[in-house]
C-alpha cells in the first residue's frame, strides 16, 4: 500500500526569537524541516505534503529545494494540530493509502521507527508513536492495555497512578487517509485554548470501535526544538551520532569532539581527520585522504590520497584529484586541482584548473575578478609557478611552462616557456643610510613639537 507524508511546519516558534521560521533553523547546516523530510523519505512516499504557516514562502522554497515533487499547503490560522493536518485534505483527495504525520521540528526520527509504525498499521486502524521518558514531566501519558492504546491522558487530568506511567505521547501517528480525515472531522475545539488537537483522534477512534495501538521509540528520536538552547542541544546530538557513524565506517577522527560535520558529509574509510576541522554542506572525501587541523571545507570533492591543510579552505566547486596537496593558508574556489598537483602555501586559486603534477609556489594569486565579471585561469600539466606570481585572468599556461618569482602574468604562456615580468633590480650605494637619517630627523622634529 502506498504512503503519504504530512509534515506540520506552520509554527512560528516564538521562543526561538527569530524572524526565520522555526523549522528552517539548521542542524548540521540543514533546516530541521529537511531532516524531517529525509527521515520520511525512507518510506518512499507517493505524496509529501508540507503544512506551512509562518514564513510560508521561505518554508515552501526549502521544501521544494529538497523535494520538487512535494506539495506545500497553507494553514492561515494556527488553530491546532488537527486543524493543521486537515489542511492537507485537498492535497490528498483520492489517496487511498496510509498517512504518516510528522513534525518539522522533530529531526531525529530513525527509518526503522517509521517502518515499525507502518507495520503496526497492518493490524491496527490508528498507530501512535510513543517513547519512554526519562522525566515524563508534563507529557501526555499513553495508557495501554496489552498492545491496545486505551487513551491519552494529559498531565493535568491524570491520576497519580497515571502520572507514574513513563510511556508518553510524541504526537506522531499513522492512519489510513480516509479514516484519518474522518476522525479529524469529528475533533472539536471545546477546550481552554479553542484549538483542534490531533491527540483527540485516539478517543474518537476508540469510541468508533477502531483498533488503536502505540509503537515505542527511544526518547531522543522525538526530541522537539522550541528554543535556541534546544537547537544547540539537537545539533550536539546530531554531531555525536554522525561522528560515531564515521568511526564505525573506518574513518579516523583524531579528536572527534572537535570535528563539525554537515548533514550530507560523506567521508571514505581510512581517511584521517585531524582536530578542529569544519565540514560545510556538500562535501565528499574519498578513501585514504587526510584533512589536517583547522581546515574548512564546503561544496567540494577530495579524491583518494589527497591532503588538505592545515589551515586550508576549500570553497564550493573545489575539486581535488588523487594525491593532490593543498597546504596551509591556501584557499581554493571553483577550481580543479589535478592529480599530484601541489598548492602548498599562502595561495588563492579561484576559477581555475591546474593540471597534473604542477607546483604552485607560495603567494601565488589568481586574479580572477575584474570588478564586474569572473575569469578563468588555465594551468597545464607539470607547470612550475614561482613564488609571488600574479596570474591575471583570463590567462592560459601551457604544459611544462614556468613563471619566475614575482612575475605578473597578463598574457598566455606557451608550453615549456618561461614567463618573466618584473621590474629590473637596481642597487643604489649608500642610499639606505641617507634615507634612514632623513626619516629619523623628521621623527625627532615631530617629537620636539609635541
Swiss-Prot record:
Cofactor note: Binds 1 Mg(2+) ion per subunit.
A molecular function GO annotation: magnesium ion binding
Entry-linked InterPro entries: Bifunctional_GlmU, GlmU-like, GlmU_C_LbH, Hexapep, MobA-like_NTP_Trfase, Nucleotide-diphossugar_trans, Trimer_LpxA-like_sf
EC number: 2.7.7.23, 2.3.1.157
GO cellular component terms given for this protein: cytoplasm; membrane
Keyword RNA-binding: no
Residue numbers spanned by region N-acetyltransferase: 250-450
Signal peptide: none
Keywords for this protein: Acyltransferase, Cell shape, Cell wall biogenesis/degradation, Cytoplasm, Magnesium, Metal-binding, Multifunctional enzyme, Nucleotidyltransferase, Peptidoglycan synthesis, Repeat, Transferase
Gene3D superfamilies: Hexapeptide repeat proteins, Spore Coat Polysaccharide Biosynthesis Protein SpsA, Chain A
The protein's name in its UniProt record: Bifunctional protein GlmU
Amino acid at each position: 500500500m502506498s504512503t503519504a507524508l504530512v509534515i506540520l511546519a506552520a509554527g512560528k516558534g516564538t521562543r526561538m526569537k527569530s524572524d526565520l521560521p522555526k523549522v528552517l533553523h539548521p542542524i548540521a547546516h540543514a533546516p530541521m524541516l529537511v531532516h524531517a523530510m529525509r527521515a520520511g523519505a525512507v518510506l518512499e512516499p507517493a505524496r509529501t505534503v508540507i503544512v506551512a504557516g509562518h514564513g510560508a514562502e521561505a518554508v515552501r522554497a526549502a521544501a521544494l529545494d529538497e523535494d520538487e515533487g512535494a506539495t506545500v499547503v497553507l494553514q492561515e490560522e494556527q488553530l491546532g494540530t488537527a486543524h493543521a493536518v486537515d489542511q492537507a485534505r485537498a492535497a490528498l483527495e483520492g489517496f487511498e493509502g496510509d498517512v504518516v504525520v510528522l513534525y518539522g521540528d522533530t529531526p531525529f526520527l530513525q527509518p526503522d521507527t517509521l517502518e515499525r509504525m507502518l507495520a503496526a498499521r497492518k493490524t491496527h486502524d490508528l498507530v501512535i508513536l510513543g517513547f519512554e521518558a526519562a522525566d515524563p514531566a508534563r507529557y501526555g501519558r499513553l495508557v495501554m492495555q496489552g498492545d491496545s492504546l486505551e487513551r491519552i491522558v494529559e498531565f493535568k487530568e491524570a491520576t497519580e497512578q497515571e502520572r507514574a506511567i513513563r510511556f508518553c505521547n510524541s504526537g506522531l501517528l499513522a492512519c489510513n487517509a480516509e479514516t484519518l480525515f474522518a476522525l479529524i472531522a469529528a475533533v472539536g475545539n471545546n477546550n481552554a485554548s479553542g484549538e483542534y488537537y490531533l491527540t483527540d483522534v485516539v478517543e474518537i477512534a476508540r469510541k468508533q470501535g477502531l483498533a488503536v495501538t502505540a509503537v515505542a521509540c527511544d526518547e531522543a528520536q522525538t526530541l522537539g526544538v522550541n528554543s535556541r538552547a534546544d537547537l544547540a542541544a539537537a545539533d550536539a546530538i546530531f554531531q555525536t551520532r554522525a561522528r560515531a557513524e564515521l568511526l564505525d565506517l573506518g574513518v579516523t577522527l583524531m579528536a572527534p569532539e572537535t570535528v563539525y560535520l554537515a548533514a550530507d558529509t560523506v567521508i571514505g574509510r581510512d581517511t584521517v581527520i585531524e582536530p578542529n576541522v569544519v565540514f560545510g554542506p556538500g562535501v565528499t572525501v574519498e578513501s585514504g585522504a587526510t584533512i589536517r587541523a583547522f581546515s574548512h571545507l564546503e561544496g567540494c570533492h577530495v579524491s583518494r590520497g589527497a591532503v588538505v591543510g592545515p589551515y586550508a579552505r576549500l570553497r564550493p566547486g573545489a575539486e581535488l584529484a588523487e594525491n593532490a596537496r593543498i597546504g596551509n593558508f591556501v584557499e581554493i574556489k571553483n577550481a580543479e586541482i589535478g592529480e599530484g598537483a601541489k598548492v602548498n602555501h599562502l595561495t588563492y586559486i579561484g576559477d581555475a584548473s591546474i593540471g597534473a603534477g604542477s607546483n604552485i609556489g607560495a603567494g601565488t594569486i589568481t586574479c580572477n575578478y575584474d570588478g564586474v565579471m569572473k575569469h578563468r585561469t588555465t594551468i597545464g600539466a607539470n607547470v612550475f609557478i614561482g613564488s609571488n606570481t600574479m596570474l591575471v585572468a583570463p590567462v592560459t599556461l601551457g604544459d611544462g611552462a614556468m613563471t619566475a618569482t614575482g612575475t605578473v602574468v597578463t598574457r598566455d604562456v606557451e608550453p615549456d616557456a618561461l614567463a618573466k615580468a618584473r621590474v629590473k633590480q637596481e642597487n643604489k650605494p649608500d642610499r639606505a643610510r641617507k634615507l634612514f637619517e632623513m626619516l629619523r630627523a623628521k621623527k625627532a622634529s615631530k617629537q620636539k613639537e609635541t
